[in-house]
Curated annotation (Swiss-Prot):
Residues 1-69, 207-341, 505-538, 614-729 are annotated as: Disordered. One of its GO terms (biological process) is negative regulation of transcription by RNA polymerase II. The keyword Transcription regulation applies. One of its GO terms (cellular component) is transcription regulator complex. Disruption phenotype: Leads to a reduced growth rate and a delayed conidiation. The gene is ptaB. Residues 614-625, 672-682 have a biased composition (Polar residues). This is Transcriptional activator ptaB. Residues 1-12, 272-285 have a biased composition (Pro residues). Pfam families: LIM_bind. Interacts with somA. It comes from Aspergillus fumigatus (strain ATCC MYA-4609 / CBS 101355 / FGSC A1100 / Af293) (Neosartorya fumigata). Transcriptional regulator that forms a complex with somA to control biofilm formation. GO terms for molecular function: transcription coregulator activity. Keywords: Activator, Nucleus, Transcription, Transcription regulation.
């Protein structure tokens, strides 16, 4: 069927239809499922055939790929570019033509990126990763277009990684490696983009200078370009360019031989115009060229007027790219900050538990000690302190006394080695440290704090006895996991003896039967008494729960810790002797803090009053009385040593000041326990209560004033009779 010659090229019956060209405007476009148009859906997740590239089934950049590249455009856009009347519109509107060319260039770059991504997916088993060797061909414009389109970002790896036969740890490691590689690639691409922008600006400046030097004879390429707009647009929309630089123009039509931009001949002033074989000018210079409707006398003035516009239009694109790179750089910086925070968090998570492990290692070394001699033991403990304690570390060792309670002694690092040695030379054979329920937390100074609510120390002594101490422990570690302060609070202690030492004592305490003791003679009983009775072994610890030598060391160490200021002052001033250093230090402290109330001088009455609050000096107006009346400072009820709660009946016995009670002038030994003492009057004595017997001569007692005649003598009571017998006898 012959085709109608008047139909537009987009119609199916139009002449010169290319077999791979786009269908007409009224036909439905058969777009590949993996190909996306600017207004169509975007493929962001691979389907069952994710390993295949989006353009599967197409050939290379030589033949049918041209039609495939044309299929990236929507139906309206393809039909628009094939209509001749729109070419005239572009020629009349240079800005619209430049915008259209820029969009067309971005579409070609998108197609190339999809092809490269498909090749990378085939190389990496369908995973759309961005490796350094896969994106080396991208230039600045392609990078900007790729990053501007959010739909062209890499596919989410979560579903694919879940299907891979790797453990969670391997997946996390792979994600971290891929993330690091992507960051490095982004940094490299940003650097390349900056270099490309600089080169582009230099080339555009050179092109602007060449355009300024051109003469009016340049209207011939524009006329030829206006005469053949359809062929130029077809060639621009069909021919793909793998790496098109921004200054490079479109390809030459088929009727003209292709020539590089550097080989374009520059026409001299006054030269005749060439009507036919002239290479196409760059596309960025076309909008600024002379329009067909202008007069010839305006042509010499046109290039100087259009040169600033050309430079502005050429500089517009690099400025837009620089503005577009600014948010990207901010995003990269934000990602770097997040990565640093994540790395610090991972380091913190990795360090969590290391302080507890260091404390358990400390306890293990303390428990595994075996004595090899005092000299070698001291070297061992010095190495022990250097390994686990900070140079400024402190041990706060606690002791417990049932009467006084808990107390702590502070030992600095230089004395710690001698402290541990003193423990093992004072009768302790082994020390076992048990830490229960240890918890670790961060310290404000950047270290770690390990706290245990229940910590036990078990001491084995040379006499087979054991001592158990229970308390709490708080250990402060620095960033090197060394102890800055080890705080041990002892709540109680218990001493245990082995059963083998208690069995002989139990046998000796068994009582013998009376029959056996009667049968034995007195000599045998004396021999058994003379035999040494078994007794408990002597305790090797004091009431504080530590050996005597250790307690003495703690007391001396506490004194030395309070004298550290004096030691430092003496070391800073070696010209002073110890007494002179002490005297100068006291004078320095007095000058810095001029308050004599805090100086412990015997001539200071305020300190004496503070030390003896119950003295006579603190008893009001009597403090200036005569020394002979010092006893008047006592309470009016008498000495507090005699009665803390005196009887109210004794209040009337208190005389005026200057008089002494009678009972206090005489010895009152047995006054409180005497049977004849009155409960109300302290100094009154009573006669002994005895039965009065009269008329002893008559031989009988009186009954109601009448003596009984001939009656038998009544026997007195045992109590009274005993006394009477002694008196009568």
């Amino acid at each position: 069927m012959p085709q109608h010659p008047g139909l537009p090229p987009g119609h199916p019956m139009a002449p010169g239809q290319h077999p791979n060209a786009h269908p007409g405007a009224g036909m439905v476009q058969a777009v590949h499922p993996g190909v996306s148009a600017p207004g169509g859906p975007q493929v962001t997740q691979g389907g069952p055939m994710m390993g295949m590239p989006p353009g599967a089934g197409t050939t290379g950049p030589g033949g049918p790929v041209q039609a495939h590249a044309l299929s990236h455009l929507g139906p309206a856009q393809a039909h628009l570019f094939q209509q001749p009347q729109f070419a005239q519109t572009f020629a009349n509107n240079p800005q619209l033509l430049q915008q259209h060319q820029h969009q067309q260039q971005i579409l070609r770059q998108r197609m190339m990126f999809q092809q490269q991504q498909a090749a990378q997916q085939q190389q990496h088993a369908g995973l759309p990763v961005s490796l350094p060797n896969g994106t080396q061909g991208l230039n600045a414009a392609q990078l900007a277009a790729m990053q501007a389109n959010s739909g062209m970002r890499p596919v989410n790896l979560q579903m694919h990684l879940q299907q891979m036969p790797h453990g969670p740890q391997n997946i996390q490691q792979q994600q971290q490696q891929l993330f690091a590689m992507q960051q490095a690639q982004q940094a490299q691409q940003a650097h390349q983009a900056q270099q490309a922008q600089q080169a582009q600006q230099a080339q555009q400046a050179a092109a602007a200078a060449a355009a300024a030097a051109a003469q009016p004879g340049q209207h011939t390429p524009q006329q030829r370009h206006a005469a053949h707009p359809q062929n130029m647009h077809d060639a621009q929309s069909v021919t793909p360019q793998p790496q098109p630089p921004p200054h490079q123009g479109s390809s030459t039509p088929q009727s003209n031989p292709p020539q590089p931009p550097s080989s374009q001949p520059q026409q001299q002033p006054g030269a005749a115009p060439q009507p036919h074989p002239t290479p196409n000018p760059p596309p960025q210079q076309l909008p600024q060229a002379q329009q067909p409707g202008q007069q010839p006398h305006q042509q010499p003035q046109q290039p100087p007027q259009q040169q600033p516009q050309q430079q502005q239009s050429q500089q517009g694109q690099p400025q837009g790219q620089q503005q577009q790179m600014t948010p990207q750089e901010a995003q990269m910086k934000a990602q770097q900050t997040q990565n640093q925070a994540a790395m610090m968090m991972q380091q913190r998570m990795g360090m969590k538990g290391t302080s507890i492990l260091a404390l358990l290692t400390f306890a293990e070394h303390l428990s595994n000690f075996t004595s090899r001699g005092e000299a070698q033991d001291l070297l061992y403990w010095q190495a022990f302190v250097d390994k686990f304690y900070s140079p400024v570390g402190v041990l706060r060792q606690g002791v417990y006394n049932p009467q006084a309670g808990s107390k702590q002694f502070e030992i600095s690092t230089p004395a710690l080695a001698r402290y541990y040695l003193t423990q093992f030379t004072s009768g302790i054979r082994q020390i076992q440290m048990l830490v229960e329920g240890a918890r670790e937390r961060d310290s404000p100074n950047g270290g770690r704090i390990v706290e245990s609510r229940r910590t036990s120390f078990i001491y084995w002594f040379t006499n087979e006895s054991q001592l158990f101490t229970n308390g709490t422990l708080i250990a402060h570690f620095d960033h090197n996991n060394k102890i800055e302060m080890l705080d041990i609070v002892v709540m109680n202690h218990t001493e245990y003896l082995p059963r083998s030492q208690l069995q002989p004592l139990e046998l000796s305490e068994q009582k013998q039967s009376p029959k056996v003791s009667k049968n034995l003679g007195k000599r045998a009983q004396q021999k058994q008494a003379q035999q040494a009775a078994p007794s408990l072994p002597e305790s090797m610890v004091t009431a504080n729960g530590v050996p005597t030598a250790v307690m003495s060391f703690l007391e001396v160490a506490e004194t030395i810790s309070h004298m550290q200021m004096l030691f430092q002052f003496s070391q800073q001033n070696p010209q002073f002797s110890p007494p002179e250093a002490l005297r100068n230090l006291v004078n320095t402290l007095q000058s810095q803090n001029p308050n004599p109330g805090f100086m412990p001088s015997p001539m200071n009455p305020a300190m004496q009053q503070g030390q003896n609050l119950r003295g006579p000096q603190m008893n009001g107006p009597n403090q200036f009385a005569s020394p002979a009346m010092a006893h008047l400072g006592l309470p009016p009820q008498g000495s507090p040593h005699l009665s803390a709660h005196p009887s109210p009946a004794q209040s009337h016995l208190a005389g005026p000041p200057g008089m002494v009670q009678q009972g206090q002038m005489q010895p009152n030994v047995g006054q409180a326990t005497s049977a004849s003492a009155s409960p109300q009057v302290t100094n009154k004595r009573r006669r002994a209560s005895t039965v009065k017997v009269e008329n002893d001569d008559t031989g009988g007692p009186e009954v109601n004033g009448t003596a009984t005649q001939g009656a038998a003598k009544v026997k007195a009571s045992p109590r009274v009779g005993g006394k009477r017998q002694k008196g009568t006898a």
